[in-house]
Every structure is written in structure tokens, then in C-alpha cells.
Amino acid sequence: MNNLKNLFVYGTLKEGGHLHDVYLKDQTFMGVYYSEPDYFMHDHGPFPIVFPVKKGTGQIIQGEIYEVDSSKFGTVKTMEEGAGYDVMTDIFLSKGGMIHRVASIFAYPPQYFKVPLDFEIKKGVVSWAV
């Protein structure tokens, strides 16, 4: 029996993204959710990069949750780690203003988030268009 995991996706793995059908087409879509304001999303052209930032000082990331089996999660993990991402688990996601799910997200390690000292993160909800 495969263990199921909640995976929060915000870029090319979302419905309509060019990697969705490759990795998540056969997994269970659980809905659109929002992260806590603990991240910064950078539009890197063909895909977004998300960095964790100090709790409560970042942006709210809009994404989708998929319930994935452990084998598929491992396949996605290998792909994401190959691109430099780390898996972060137990992020809290809301729907309608209330915490509804805990999931894993792939984000770049915080040490790669290099910005000028006067850089200000634009607050609010951000979403990457596929």
C-alpha cells in the first residue's frame, strides 16, 4: 500500500503547466490553497522560484494541492532536487482563511536568496500563470 502525501505546487506542476501531465496527471487534485506569508516568489522566466523567508514577512503563494502516492512523490523529488530545490514539509495551507491542510513544498534553499539590503518584498498573494 502506498502512503499518500499532500504536495503543494505553484508553477510548472500546476494544471496547465508543462510538467503537470508528466508528473501529476494521474494524482488526486485536492484544490487551490494558499501558503502562509513565509515565502518569496521570483519569476525566473520559464518557471518560478520560491524561497522561504522569515516567518510572516513574505508573500502568500497561491497553488494547488495534489494527493500523491509515495512513488510519484519520490519521482517529483528527484526531478526538483536535480533543479536545486529542497523539499520542505509541514507547511500550513489555507482555504477560505482557515488552515485546512499540511503539505510538502519544493523551494530553493534560503541561502540562495541574495538581495540588496534595501530590498522589500511586495506583500500579498502571488500566483504564477501557466
Model-flagged regions — what are they?
Residues 2-130:
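Glycine-aromatic micro-motifs
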